[in-house]
UniProtKB/Swiss-Prot annotation:
Reactions that this protein is recorded to catalyse: 6-(2-amino-2-carboxyethyl)-7,8-dioxo-1,2,3,4,7,8-hexahydroquinoline-2,4-dicarboxylate + 3 O2 = pyrroloquinoline quinone + 2 H2O2 + 2 H2O + H(+)
Signal peptide positions on this chain: none
Protein name in UniProt: Pyrroloquinoline-quinone synthase
Gene Ontology MF terms in the entry: pyrroloquinoline-quinone synthase activity
Protein family membership: Belongs to the PqqC family.
Gene Ontology BP, a term: pyrroloquinoline quinone biosynthetic process
Pathway: Cofactor biosynthesis; pyrroloquinoline quinone biosynthesis
Organism: Cereibacter sphaeroides (strain ATCC 17029 / ATH 2.4.9) (Rhodobacter sphaeroides)
Pfam families: TENA_THI-4 (PF03070)
Length: 255
């Protein structure tokens, strides 16, 4: 597959306003978001085997189940009660609440539907080392960098609805083992992600007040795109090129 990964990012320039920062953020998303990755093109275009889709869902589970951990860390960074209250709904979006299904539950419906043993998925024993390292790096980032950068790292949600819509239509049309029930996670995120992105964007526009702070916001988004891209690089290396590391999940057709 030939994929043009050239970018149209503007030359480095001081970010003198919130509008200039937002323009830069959107340029970063257009150039670096993981919808451009070859593995996603294969996934959405029906080019993967069921085993390769299983490997993707299994590894992505580690990211999904760590998101509320990351969000709990973000909450812990703020003395401002209003910010904590706003961010708290993200925990329930993923963890769920008493009597209410969350995103992790919906992801497990996907892995169940793909024929993966739930206990094995939840153990995370079969994930790739790069998956674990990338996801843990994200948690460490929001713990160790400024609260502003912690929120900015979530701005990939600005670009998520498009990839979710593409994934829903592409996977439903190309794979006979995919149905609307197992795609419920992505359907829900079509409404959740824009709400979350709108808040995060407002926050960084209001609180990044110097060119240096605005540059830090942009670099936080770049870091997050690298976290996502690294996971797909690892999946492609292991399950498309066939270099599965010891201890990782091996699809039936590769055994």
């Amino acid at each position: 597959m030939s994929l043009d990964l050239s970018t149209s990012l503007s030359p480095a320039r001081p970010l003198e306003s919130a509008d200039a920062m937002e323009e830069r953020l959107r340029e970063i998303g257009a150039a670096r978001y993981h919808d451009r990755h070859p593995f996603h093109h294969m996934l959405h275009g029906g080019e993967l085997t069921k085993g390769q889709v299983q490997a993707w869902a299994l590894n992505r589970y580690y990211y999904q189940c760590t998101i509320p951990v990351k969000d709990a860390v973000v909450i812990s960074r703020f003395r401002d009660r209003a910010t904590r209250i706003e961010w708290r709904h993200r925990l329930e979006d993923h963890d769920g609440a008493e009597g209410a299904e969350g995103g992790i539950d919906r992801w497990l419906i996907l892995t169940d539907g793909l024929g993966l043993d739930r206990a094995y998925v939840e153990s995370t024993d079969g994930i790739l080392p790069a998956t674990r390292f990338a996801v843990e790096a994200y948690v460490h980032f929001v713990r160790d960098r400024s609260p502003l950068e912690a929120i900015a790292s979530c701005l990939t949600e600005l670009f998520a609805p498009n990839i979710h819509a593409t994934r829903i239509s592409g996977m439903l049309s190309h794979y006979d083992f995919i149905n609307p029930t197992v795609m419920a996670y992505f359907q829900r995120r079509l409404t959740q992600a824009p709400r979350d992105a709108d808040y995060a964007l407002r926050y960084v526009r209001d609180h990044a007040r110097t060119p240096e702070e605005r540059a830090a916001v942009c670099n936080a988004l770049i870091f997050k795109t690298q976290v996502l891209w690294t996971q797909l690089d690892a999946l492609h290396h292991a399950y498309v090129l066939g270099h599965v590391p010891p201890g990782a999940f091996v699809p039936e057709e590769m055994r």
